[in-house]
Regions:
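ABC family nucleotide-binding domain
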Residues: 2-164
């Protein structure tokens, strides 16, 4: 099976005043294609730090992180942003929808960073995807006009198959 994510002795330290906080202490694991993984732990155990690392939002202090065989730790922020846009989808707890934009516009946003997708294709994909998840009647609604479940579907659509070239 193909390795999708591989972490080798990942450590992440933060400096808080005079104190060094060791958020991740030598995390190692591999996730193979087709596997589903759950990250669990008590408050303050490093779950968010680990997820931010896996999502290319943060870099480890030391260790090796390979995403689809590509070393992530030494990449620049712009390189990580491109990798994140092409390989990773997020559904945040608060959905991170832009409040003054419509469902279609929120779904289109991640594709704006994909130079292979034209504006008309981006809009077409967004509309088709929202219809597919039962939101055809909410295309032009803003987030404050949708239920929590509807917002979650908008967020899920925007960060899954739509980012593919």
């Amino acid at each position: 099976m193909k390795k999708i994510i591989e972490l080798q002795n990942i450590k992440r330290n933060f400096q808080v005043g005079d104190e060094t906080v060791h958020a991740l202490r030598g995390i190692s694991f591999t996730i193979y294609e087709g596997e589903f993984v759950t990250i669990m732990g008590t408050s303050g155990s490093g779950k968010s730090t680990l997820l931010n690392t896996l999502g290319c939002l943060d870099t480890p202090t030391s260790g090796e992180y390979l995403l689809d065989g590509v070393s992530v730790r030494t990449m620049s922020k712009p390189q990580r942003a491109v990798l994140r846009n092409r390989k990773i989808g997020f559904v945040f707890q608060n959905y991170n929808l832009l409040p003054k934009t419509t469902a279609v516009e929120n779904v289109e946003l991640p594709l704006m960073y994909n130079s292979f997708v034209s504006a008309s294709e981006r809009r077409k994909r967004a509309i088709e995807s929202l219809i597919a998840v039962g939101l055809g009647d909410r295309l032009e609604h803003k987030s404050n006009q949708m239920s929590g479940g509807q917002m979650q579907r908008v967020a899920t659509v925007s960060y899954t198959h739509l980012t593919l070239p």
